Amino acid sequence: MPKLLVVETSPRGAASISRNITKTFVAKWKAAHADSAVVQRDLTGTGLEFVTAPWLEAYFTPPDQHTDAMKQALALSDELVAELLNADELVIGTPVYNYNVPALLKAWIDHIVRKGITLGMDGKGLLTGKKATVLIASGGIYSEGSPIADRAIAPQYLKLILGVIGIENVTIVAGGGAKAVDMGEATMDGFIATLDSELTAAAQ
């Protein structure tokens, strides 16, 4: 049974363009994988903290030497890592803030890049064989040929970090120009329809 882990980052709820793109993708993925399971991880409701000194102390201490406090410091990180390890496929739905990923998504990344678990002690990624789809909603259009294509930092970063942990099969669906929805120049459904063929292909 294929299992899909869905990581959501936008705080905008039903008004979120990235969440609506993700919703469409998940529906297509479920249709293409009848006997499947979907695990939802909404980072806005996770209580995810940024890396702290106690977290780092626990991170660099061998597991067999962990105190109860160290185990507690890594508890949420362990939970997030387990979700990723148990998934066959990963989809990340995210807006773009100031050309990069939201702070919450960066925090999730810091919690799941774990030496000896998702990243080998030799620096090689351990999550080989998994597939990832990154769904991005951005106000600007950063596709090839755009005069601001060099500002496509978010997709470059996410593809890089996924590769670091061993996920090389990464599909990026970039919903550039999403500000048209917020400005009333396009409907949500109309905007997502422009991505339909890419979403369908990515969901297979």
Curated annotation (Swiss-Prot):
GO terms for molecular function: electron transfer activity; FMN binding; oxidoreductase activity, acting on NAD(P)H as acceptor; oxidoreductase activity, acting on NAD(P)H, quinone or similar compound as acceptor. Keywords: Flavoprotein, FMN, NAD, Oxidoreductase. FMN binds at residues 10, 16-18. InterPro entries: Flavodoxin_fold, Flavoprotein-like_sf, FMN-dep_NADH:Q_OxRdtase_AzoR1, NADH:quinone_OxRdtase_FMN_depd. Disulfide bonds: none annotated. Its cofactor is FMN. Pfam families: Flavodoxin_2 (PF02525). Binds 1 FMN per subunit. The keyword GTP-binding does not apply. Coiled coil: none annotated. It catalyses: 2 a quinone + NADH + H(+) = 2 a 1,4-benzosemiquinone + NAD(+); N,N-dimethyl-1,4-phenylenediamine + anthranilate + 2 NAD(+) = 2-(4-dimethylaminophenyl)diazenylbenzoate + 2 NADH + 2 H(+). Its EC number is 1.6.5.-, 1.7.1.17. Belongs to the azoreductase type 1 family. Homodimer. Quinone reductase that provides resistance to thiol-specific stress caused by electrophilic quinones. This is FMN-dependent NADH:quinone oxidoreductase 2. The gene is azoR2.
